[in-house]
Amino acid sequence: MAIQAQKGTKDMLPNDAYKWHYIEEKLRKISAEYGIREIRTPMFEATELFKRGVGETTDVVQKEMYTFEDKGGRSITLKPEGTAPAVRAFIENSLYADAQPTKMFYFTPCFRYEKMQKGRLREFHQYGIEVFGSQEASIDAEILSLVMRALTEDFGIKGLSLNINSLGCPKCRAKFNEALKQYLKENYDNLCETCKTRFEKNPMRIIDCKEKRCKEIVKEAPSILDYICEECSDHFSKLKAYLDVMGIEYNIDPQIVRGLDYYSKTVFEVIKDGLTVCGGGRYDYLVEEVDGPKTPAMGFGLGLERLLLILDEEGIEIPEPVRCEVYIGSMGDRAKLEAMKLAFNLRKSGIKAEIDHLGKSVKAQMKYANKIGAKYTFVIGDSEIEENKIKIKRMSDGEQFEVSLDINEIVNIVK
């Protein structure tokens, strides 16, 4: 039996690669407009980082991580998300000593052993932004403006909903958790086994449960917005004011808690037809939690597979780049040498050029050139070499002509 790709993974084939390049280039460009620079972190980290950073009661840590022991006896985990590794890098490399805020973006593969769903595999890819060093609501609004601009203006996606909430600070949450536990007590026996554990350790996680019975129970649960303190309420009001002044529409959804324990104050999700396209929020205590200095922070993750799926479903075309500008057909060994030389010089001039490497007939070479979408086809044989000329056909209109084998003249025609 042939070895196949593992369940939940997918090959990115050459015919699809340009789509990934397109969205990555768009996201790199808008990141630069906001003064955000790239970071790259390792594929795997110490398991302890995610236990402490993401939260031991989360589904990610309890059920979904790919964890193994390496040959040195260390517990290692393939990263299930990008924020905790970015925080670790921020601390380990003393980036907190630089001028703040520190703004970074990344493209990274992530790994979660979870039930596969539309636009989400077990190995998936994220574009993420993390901003360290500012506790102002203005940075939250700035990042949300980037997200909505990218999705609506750069990619042209319609029908998106930006939903926001505030999870307050630890003091707010302590009061809310007590109220939530009081509400949940009468339905405790109907909770799933995981949520029964959460009831004592972290009742807010129950709001994020995907089990149908638990989702029904929390529908009428208390709203955390009724329990946030004056400072957190002021922060949320400022966020809304900043979004209003930029003309960014939003909905307030008190049931957004996100699936990771590190969030505080602002949390958000961008929804399209019931699917979360993008989500994130503020995590003012995470840097301290993993032994760094007290540092407020804000970030989000955007699933690239899901983004590509939406673009496809919306009929938004991604322009396919020209694969081959010039195909040089040759007849005989002498002509093959000239074709090799010409292709080399064309490529040096920035022109995409190909030649035959299979010993095909000229007819078969021209058929291949047409198949790969060559803009021009050249033909070289012994007579062309003797006359120092080359036959050129412009594929768009079929016009044929001859020019000298002078590289500068050929480049001017093609460009």
Curated annotation (Swiss-Prot):
Its EC number is 6.1.1.21. One of its GO terms (molecular function) is histidine-tRNA ligase activity. Keywords: Aminoacyl-tRNA synthetase, ATP-binding, Cytoplasm, Ligase, Nucleotide-binding, Protein biosynthesis. It catalyses: tRNA(His) + L-histidine + ATP = L-histidyl-tRNA(His) + AMP + diphosphate + H(+). It is found in: Cytoplasm. Transmembrane segments: none annotated. One of its GO terms (biological process) is histidyl-tRNA aminoacylation. Its main location: cytoplasm. Gene3D superfamilies: Anticodon-binding domain, Bira Bifunctional Protein, Domain 2. One of its GO terms (cellular component) is cytoplasm. InterPro entries: aa-tRNA-synth_II (IPR006195), aa-tRNA-synth_II/BPL/LPL (IPR045864), Anticodon-bd (IPR004154), Anticodon-bd_dom_sf (IPR036621), His-tRNA-ligase (IPR015807), HisRS-like_core (IPR041715), HisRS/HisZ (IPR004516), HisRS_anticodon (IPR033656). NCBIfam families: hisS. Homodimer. Belongs to the class-II aminoacyl-tRNA synthetase family. PANTHER family: HISTIDINE--TRNA LIGASE, MITOCHONDRIAL-RELATED (PTHR43707:SF1), HISTIDYL-TRNA SYNTHETASE (PTHR43707). This is Histidine--tRNA ligase. It comes from Clostridium perfringens (strain SM101 / Type A). The lineage of its organism: Bacteria, Bacillati, Bacillota, Clostridia, Eubacteriales.
